[in-house]
């Protein structure tokens, strides 16, 4: 009886959905940047531990304000940034 109860509780716990944050809910502690060019990480030039994208060519810090600064290009969140000239490595595209 006790074994059946444990198995039932484990099945219920495994079936409970967990909510994954959408891209709009993602926290970006290191800063949001506006990139004119965003390239996918190919693993050849970019270090293996980098995230999904690199951001290069004209970076500026984006302030999310409805009236003033807006990014007309791709906004990205950069974590564990490795900067080499004008290219930031470890940037993930986000929707603002």
Swiss-Prot record:
Gene Ontology molecular function: structural constituent of cell wall
Cystine crosslinks: 28-77, 34-71, 35-55, 78-91
Keywords: Cell wall, Cell wall biogenesis/degradation, Disulfide bond, Secreted, Signal, Stress response
Induction, per UniProt: Expression is induced during nutrient deprivation and during formation of infection structures.
Main location: secreted
Annotated PROSITE patterns: HYDROPHOBIN
InterPro entries, alphabetized: Hydrophobin (IPR001338), Hydrophobin_CS (IPR019778)
Residues making up the signal peptide according to the UniProt record: 1-19
GO biological process, one term: cell wall organization
A GO cellular component entry from the record: extracellular region
CDD domains linked to this entry: hydrophobin_I (cd23507)
Compartments, record wording: Secreted; Secreted, Cell wall
Cited function: Aerial growth, conidiation, and dispersal of filamentous fungi in the environment rely upon a capability of their secreting small amphipathic proteins called hydrophobins (HPBs) with low sequence identity. Class I can self-assemble into an outermost layer of rodlet bundles on aerial cell surfaces, conferring cellular hydrophobicity that supports fungal growth, development and dispersal; whereas Class II form highly ordered films at water-air interfaces through intermolecular interactions but contribute nothing to the rodlet structure.
Quaternary state and interactors: Self-assembles to form functional amyloid fibrils called rodlets. Self-assembly into fibrillar rodlets occurs spontaneously at hydrophobic:hydrophilic interfaces and the rodlets further associate laterally to form amphipathic monolayers.
Family of this protein: Belongs to the fungal hydrophobin family.
The protein's name: Class I hydrophobin ssgA
Phylogenetic classification of the source organism: Eukaryota, Fungi, Dikarya, Ascomycota, Pezizomycotina
């Amino acid at each position: 009886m006790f074994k059946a109860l444990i198995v039932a509780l484990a099945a219920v716990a495994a079936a409970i959905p967990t909510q994954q944050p959408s891209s709009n809910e993602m926290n970006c502690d290191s800063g949001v940047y506006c990139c004119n060019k965003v390239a996918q990480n190919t693993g050849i030039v970019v270090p293996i531990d980098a995230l999904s994208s690199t951001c290069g060519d004209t970076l500026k810090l984006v302030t999310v304000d409805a009236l003033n600064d807006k990014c007309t290009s791709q906004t990205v969140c950069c974590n564990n940034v490795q900067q080499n000239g004008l290219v930031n490595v470890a940037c993930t595209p986000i929707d603002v």
